[in-house]
A protein has these predicted regions:
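Hydrophobic alpha-helical
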Residues: 37-39, 43-113
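Hydrophobic alpha-helical segments within soluble ligand-binding/sensing domains
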Residues: 11, 15, 49-55, 106-110, ...
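Second-shell loop/turn segments in exported
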Residues: 2-6, 37-45, 66-70, 120-124, ...
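Flexible, solvent-exposed loop/hinge segments that line or gate ligand/substrate-binding clefts
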Residues: 105-106, 122-125, 171
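Hinge/cleft segment of the Venus flytrap/periplasmic-binding protein
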Residues: 3-4, 8, 19-23, 30-32, ...
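Structured segments of extracytoplasmic/periplasmic soluble domains
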Residues: 19-26, 54-64, 85-89, 113, ...
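Short, solvent-exposed amphipathic alpha-helices that sit
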Residues: 8-34, 50-54, 81-85
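Extracellular/periplasmic ligand-binding modules, especially the Venus flytrap/periplasmic-binding
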Residues: 70, 74-86, 114-115, 121, ...
């Protein structure tokens, strides 16, 4: 029984749709391609050109008579590939506007795409703060102190809860990119031109 339960937990952990499942069940959100399992939606090496080819195939197979409303991308490099596929399929015109395309990591190309009104947003995690937190944890471990954590319950690996130190991510879009990314010194105005 414990083994079956463990497999069920692992299977549940790899379902991409868990937070979205109520919306899918009510048909408020429809994944036209039917691809919702992690193994179906994973992009090898997070590669933009691979994501572009995959999106081109999805558009050709599942969206000939319907339009795409949103693409939830886990990484900005993938978002750029998705946008290239959408644009080559005619999206981005007044008769066929670009869908909402999200991303993560506030990469330069995606921030420029946000400024241009293409990508809708990106999730920004300041690597300077991440590096500082990691460095502090390493120092604590090297000096025999327990590393500082601020979350002991959320992250589970199938066996136990894994303590973590979480930093607050920031959603960046056209309305706040300058304040979040330029004022903080992450990018300069010249880099974003």
């Amino acid at each position: 029984m414990a083994t079956q339960r463990h497999h069920r937990l692992r299977a549940r952990a790899v379902r991409l749709t868990d937070p979205l499942q109520p919306y899918l069940d009510k048909k408020q959100l429809v994944v036209q391609s039917g691809q919702t399992e992690l193994k179906q939606v994973t992009t090898l090496r997070w590669d933009g050109p691979t994501a572009q080819k995959r999106m081109e195939a999805i558009l050709a197979e599942s969206y000939r008579s319907k339009s795409v409303d949103a693409v939830l991308s886990p990484y900005d490099g993938i978002s750029i590939g998705v946008l290239a596929a959408l644009k080559s399929d005619g999206y981005g015109s007044s008769s066929k506007p670009l869908p909402v395309v999200t991303g993560q990591d506030a990469e330069l190309a995606s921030v420029k795409s946000i400024i241009a009104g293409e990508q809708a947003q990106t999730v920004y995690k300041d690597f300077r703060l991440l590096g500082e937190a990691a460095s502090d944890m390493i120092d604590d471990i090297r000096n025999g102190r327990p590393p500082k954590v601020n979350n002991r319950r959320t992250y589970k690996n199938g066996v136990k809860a894994v303590p973590a130190y979480l930093l607050e991510p920031t959603s960046v879009d056209k309305s706040n990119y300058e304040y979040v990314l330029v004022v903080s010194g992450y990018y300069t105005n010249a880099e974003l031109k």
